[in-house]
């Protein structure tokens, strides 16, 4: 019996525009590989509909590395997140599903990871950060949170100086990204003298 201690998030790697019925297509593809049925426990459609694949206690077929099929729930979002982002509805549904399953199975935040954490793939998409929970928090509150005047001023300065394009102002940055911003700011101040 599978008792999940991890949640692994995937994408179908098929653009929403190319196939609107990805649950059935994914199920058929997985069956063609001899897996019996869809390998994920859940699949989330663009409108936020959560579809059950395998039962939570059923062995998954989504992440073979480090026996993760035995130790995790596989949640897949429809879309190709190497070229597009999940819809807000998908983010809300994913966030709610993750929180519910974390409570149900005592899964730590650190154990909610993208597929690429275990496999040499881009999955859950190159356009998306590794920190799934922070990303979801920002995406689900983005429409309701207004930036303060000082924040808008700072963003405009960053855009005007070419340090950043100012997009996704509430998203965290890696140390390497911060170093690059500092380097650009240094060059801006040196050239301004």
Task: Please provide the spans of the model-predicted regions.
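Basic/polar, cationic surfaces and motifs that engage anionic cell-wall
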Residues: 1-16, 20, 46-71, 77-142
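Residue-level detector of short, conserved catalytic/binding motifs and their immediate flanks
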Residues: 5-7, 38-40, 73, 176
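Glycan-recognition patch characteristic of GH18 chitinases/ENGases
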Residues: 18-37, 43
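Stable alpha-helical elements in mature extracytoplasmic
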Residues: 19-22, 26, 90-97, 150-154, ...
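Structured segments of extracytoplasmic/periplasmic soluble domains
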Residues: 26-33, 61, 97-104, 135, ...
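Surface-exposed patches in mature extracellular/periplasmic domains of secreted proteins
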Residues: 34-41, 105-115, 167
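Short, flexible loop/turn motifs enriched in small residues
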Residues: 36, 68-70, 150
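Short, solvent-exposed alpha-helical surface patches in non-cytosolic proteins
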Residues: 140-193
